[in-house]
């Protein structure tokens, strides 16, 4: 029997809030076919995750879940049940135009992105999460969840309410400022409307009292992910004065009232329950591994290639934790809309740092591996899978275009990788176009100042890693029969143009290769041992 660990800040026994009620109901659905365990988020450690690495994790409210545990969870099969906009620092999208927060307000994107699925309650809730995070693993229930006991209470009170109302307007009394009691009272006073305040910690008593009123004044001050109160009020026959923060009001069935609404809610909940169980049951079929990889793309003179690159990264059979973009300043990318890129972080520079800049940015990665791509490089769907398999037997700097020097000048070399499509792993002197390496090896690149900042970062990286870390360089298999394993599938189409550094007018062809010859000779002079034993 599969094991499911449900992680949340509080259980329903501690706090009977909307999120906790949803969690309790979904957890009860899983009890029939799974071994389940509830864990308080504040008590979960990385050891907890390691000891249950083969389990399925479902994360609900996670304020008290440590960042380290969140990071570690991204190596597992986990779902998120989203409550209260924990992808925003403010926990509320309502102040922002079209409910889209500025990028500096968005948080936890990689945690949401790397979940198998993110479950949202109302349809509008799911749309808002998707627009802010720009992720494609959202599932909206179009409903929330009530226990059978609570459904029975609603049905009894709906029946009683249909016989007539005895009271006029009600405002829910709450110490929670975001529930808008003060604003609702101010509204009634401004409109010279009478009202009563009401609260009751017992659900049955609360709904019975609510059903006595003809109207609910409810003006929540944050964007509610559903608002069960609004639905309950309409089921027991209340008209409503509300605001745009009630996301349940956007559901097509919200216009119903009384028992008609209750019956529709039952159908919607049943469909949502089936959807939830189907997704959890199918996790092994639908799950794509997430590896501890940070991707760094480079934007320079081919910005229009970047959406295609991002799409290729997102289609990898083994996905990275995050995608970053390093932008070197150039007039060719000035007008490109960076906001449309589906990436996690952008280094938007006002200077052209050339080839080394992205490797400097890579030092900020907090993952085991880093993958760097030139702006003309589109990987096959299994490139990361290929690299990780290669690492098991040939740990080293990996790349999609390998170079084996035949002399002490760069132009005299043999190639492997996508240009020649090698069947087996090949040891090479350097790689380019796409790099895959352990982040810890970046330290070697910066041990010595390179002979030039204008060229040869690929040569210098392999030389420095070999000299200071004993790290070799390899080209993974690029079999002709399986381009999905290739590090570049459109190299000829995208890379041979006037914008290539080796061809363009800004750097003459002769100057480019003269600089590379100098970098090669400097490396050999200072101890670089090439595959063919090249000497000066």
Residue ranges of each PLM-predicted region?
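N-terminal pre-catalytic "stem/leader" segment of glycosyltransferase-like enzymes
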Residues: 1-65, 241-270, 277-297, 307
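Extended catalytic core of nucleotide-activated donor transferases of GT-like folds
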Residues: 39-116, 124, 305-311, 333-335, ...
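A short, active-site helix/loop in glycosyltransferases that binds the activated sugar's phosphate group
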Residues: 113-138, 182-183
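Conserved catalytic-core segment of nucleotide-activated headgroup transferases in glycan assembly
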Residues: 144-206, 302-304
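C-terminal catalytic/acceptor-binding lobe
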Residues: 286-291, 305-309, 448-536
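Short, acidic, metal-binding catalytic loop of nucleotide-sugar glycosyltransferases
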Residues: 311-321
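Active-site nucleotide-sugar/metal-binding loop of Leloir-type enzymes
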Residues: 359-369
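Conserved catalytic core of nucleotide-sugar-dependent glycosyltransferases
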Residues: 362, 378-450
């Amino acid at each position: 029997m599969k094991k499911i660990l449900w992680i949340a800040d509080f259980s329903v026994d501690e706090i009977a809030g909307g999120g906790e009620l949803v969690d309790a109901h979904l957890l009860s659905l899983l009890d029939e076919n799974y071994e389940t365990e509830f864990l308080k988020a504040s008590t979960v450690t990385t050891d907890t995750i390691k000891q249950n690495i083969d389990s399925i994790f479902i994360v609900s409210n996670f304020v008290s879940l440590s960042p380290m545990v969140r990071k570690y969870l991204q190596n597992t099969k986990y779902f998120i049940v989203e409550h209260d906009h924990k992808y925003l620092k403010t926990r509320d999208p309502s102040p922002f135009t079209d409910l889209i927060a500025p990028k500096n307000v968005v948080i936890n994107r990689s945690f949401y992105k790397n979940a198998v699925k993110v479950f949202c309650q109302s349809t509008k809730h799911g749309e808002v999460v998707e627009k802010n995070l720009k992720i494609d693993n959202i599932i909206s229930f179009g409903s929330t969840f009530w226990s059978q006991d609570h459904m029975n209470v609603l049905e009894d009170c709906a029946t009683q309410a249909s016989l007539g109302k005895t009271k006029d307007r009600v405002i829910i009394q709450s110490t929670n400022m975001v529930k808008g009691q003060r604003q609702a009272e101010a509204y009634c006073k401004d409109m010279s409307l009478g009202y009563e305040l009401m609260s009751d910690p017992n659900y049955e008593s609360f709904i019975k009292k609510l059903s006595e009123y003809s109207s609910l004044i409810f003006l929540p001050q944050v964007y509610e992910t559903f608002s069960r109160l609004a639905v309950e009020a309409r089921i027991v026959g209340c008209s409503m004065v509300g605001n745009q923060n009630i996301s349940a009001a956007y559901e097509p069935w919200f216009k119903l009232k009384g028992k008609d609404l209750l019956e529709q809610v039952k159908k919607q909940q049943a469909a949502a329950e089936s959807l939830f169980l189907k997704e959890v049951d199918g996790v092994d079929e639908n799950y794509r591994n997430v590896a501890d990889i940070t991707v760094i793309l480079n934007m320079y003179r081919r910005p229009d290639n970047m959406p295609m690159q991002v799409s290729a990264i997102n289609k990898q059979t083994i996905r990275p934790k995050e995608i970053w973009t390093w932008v070197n300043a150039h007039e060719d990318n000035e007008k490109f809309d960076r906001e449309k890129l589906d990436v996690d972080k952008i280094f938007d520079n006002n200077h052209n740092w050339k080839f080394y800049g992205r490797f400097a940015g890579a030092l900020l990665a907090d993952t085991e591996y880093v993958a760097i791509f030139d702006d003309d490089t589109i990987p096959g769907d299994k490139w990361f899978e290929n690299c990780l398999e290669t690492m098991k037997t040939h740990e080293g700097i990996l790349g999609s275009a390998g170079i084996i020097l035949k002399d002490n000048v760069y132009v005299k070399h043999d190639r492997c990788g996508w240009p020649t499509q090698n069947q087996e792993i090949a040891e090479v002197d350097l790689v380019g176009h796409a790099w895959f390496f352990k982040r810890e090896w970046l330290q070697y690149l910066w041990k010595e100042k390179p002979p030039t900042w204008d060229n040869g970062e690929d040569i210098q990286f392999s030389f420095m890693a070999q000299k200071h870390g004993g790290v070799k360089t390899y080209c993974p298999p690029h079999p002709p029969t399986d381009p999905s394993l290739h590090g570049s599938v459109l190299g000829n189409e995208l890379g041979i143009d006037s914008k290539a550094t080796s061809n363009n007018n800004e750097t003459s062809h002769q100057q480019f290769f003269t600089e590379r010859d100098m970098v090669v000779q400097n490396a050999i002079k200072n101890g670089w041992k090439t595959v063919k034993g090249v000497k000066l």
